[in-house]
């Protein structure tokens, strides 16, 4: 006779045995993951500490500068494998600078949480999302969503702070005037009254108005060409937000404004526009066009890689002399953040 089993699966004691073992292994896995996260976070912090201490070790090391992380990435990867690319090392360094004392790191958050938090340009903003992530037990995806929706800035500007937090905790995407659409970068940049509510299209129009006026008033050779400049590329229609011609540099300047974080695709799209201008718009005696992608947040490494293609060093020097520096443009967007300390 075939033995189909030694136990009765309907037996309560047997079901309890299954439940106990399942619970045991679930807790064990959870503890293991927590332990791994703790060790990973501490190791990343310590790595950042080593890098900063090395940088501060003397003048010669300081002059080693930007090549340090590039060389470290190559050598550490060769010896230890993946996980030590330049971007990761940059964020490990940022982690130490943001949290100089290891004891202030909360192990309730993962390295992926800190990776997103360290993208904040403003310490106050980072601390806000840091505390909210712990308090509300946000997963990484939820943290990214809240940051993208500019929860910190909307909360700082709103008189109904509890209402804004309630909307955020409900997972509600702010998309209409009734949802308190208030982007602090746009409001400050465009000089709009804070008490009024605007549609997203109104805010973007005001932002472009202000950017256009800002560049023209700088008196550095900018001539306005057009807004929402249309380009037919293949079978598709594209539009770039603002186009200027720089009379001193003898080149077109294309500007794309992004309300959220600048993505790799935004840089690629700008490169597409630049190639179009080189082929279809520029005259033989024009210099290559310049593209500026401006957003609420930026990844310095991404921006650096995106500008790698400029090889004419003389042209780059004139670019730095006559065009507004990246910091000048970003300052126009970030200005309000300095005024929010007393608002929260």
List the model feature ranges, each with a label.
Residues 1-344:
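Basic, low-complexity intrinsically disordered segments
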